[in-house]
């Protein structure tokens, strides 16, 4: 109204746009004075002050990533990147740090301050151990921190998992120190070298099976490590006793395979075959006798007996024959075959 009579009032309005400095300051305080005219004179009011407090929300966000897709060997490195962002509404100051349960993280200490929305990038590397391969993955947890005044501001936890490429493997190398055999009862000595050729540790039970070694003979393994680390090996031995069938066959061929465990899963080796040749010695001995002491006239008969013995180490087969420069010899054609030590008359 005009004039503004005593006791009357008017209401004025204004808006103010908050700045980052206002948030940093913690409040907006402003002072106002009103004026009007009385004739030619200016009438000035008292000063009035209003303070509006800021809601200061210091905040820090961590985003952890890796460029390493997986790992498969001891000594492999995993590279990590940590993006640390001021997600609050007030500046933060150093020291900037990232705590990681697997590695030491390097963070830049600039800019100072770290204003809202700004970020820094920290880095770290981790070297893979055998335990990491055995575990199947590297899982690590990180947290970032910065300062707001005297207070420490802590970020969220962020976890990154990098999987292992586990390659359980077992290699069997079978050998013998026996070059050959030629008699029933000969023994063939075998050795079995079982190596963990994979990249993770293996556990018992360990076993070597051989198609020629059975009760009462067994494959005997000594000094078994537990676990069997990659590159480690153990040695087993076995003895095989030659049979007539082995001599007849011309060789002993046997196939072996090793097994171990990866947790609840069996790990099977290659099959390895060793062939030991027989020294086959076919032989025949003739023992010729007569029951006729002498003769004294034409027409007397002389009786001969021919003992034909298989004196070798392999069976012989018909036709059986004896050649005699004086007579024709009749030989039975059984048994067939004529085994070592057997004879016909």
What is the predicted role of each segment?
Residues 1-345:
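Exported/extracytosolic protein signature
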